[in-house]
Amino acid sequence: VSNFGNVQIYKSNNTKAQAWNFIKYESPRSQLDSMAKKYNADIQETTYVVQCYKNNNYSLGSSGSNVQISNSNQKWRIKKDSVGYITFINVSTNKALDVYGGHSSNSTNVWQYNYNNSLAQKWIAKKNSDGSLTFVSALDKNHVLDISGGLIQNRQNVQLYQNNGTNAQKFKLTKI
């Protein structure tokens, strides 16, 4: 058996060459929906400060429409949909945490935008073994909320980036 090997019809001989394993295909959307359902119970619909996991002095904030790390402790209200995705709504601006342009690629900016219930505004709060949370984008299971350059400092930009498990992608929620 090798890649690009020919398949042909042949009389049964009960060899491994004639044994098949069928794997159920699950679409990327279905995989994300399953993940959202799995982690749905870990988060309550209420208001939080979204803090950096390793440095409580910094949290998710905004400057105009852009989202960045700051020491302002801005409040975000979490709402859930029927599938299990969460949406962050900034209490001050009533705008949602949104992936700019709905593009799931490295370094795509995250900003605040009018709530529109799109996948660009939906997240999965995946609980990590160390107790932190990683926010997976509903656009792509491999892209998560990330602090640009891994620098946890005031006014550092927040973006979408491929999941790499670093502290720049770990957060904690403090209930208000």
For each of these PLM feature ranges, what is it?
Residues 1-176:
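Lectin-like carbohydrate-binding module/patch detector with strong preference for beta-trefoil
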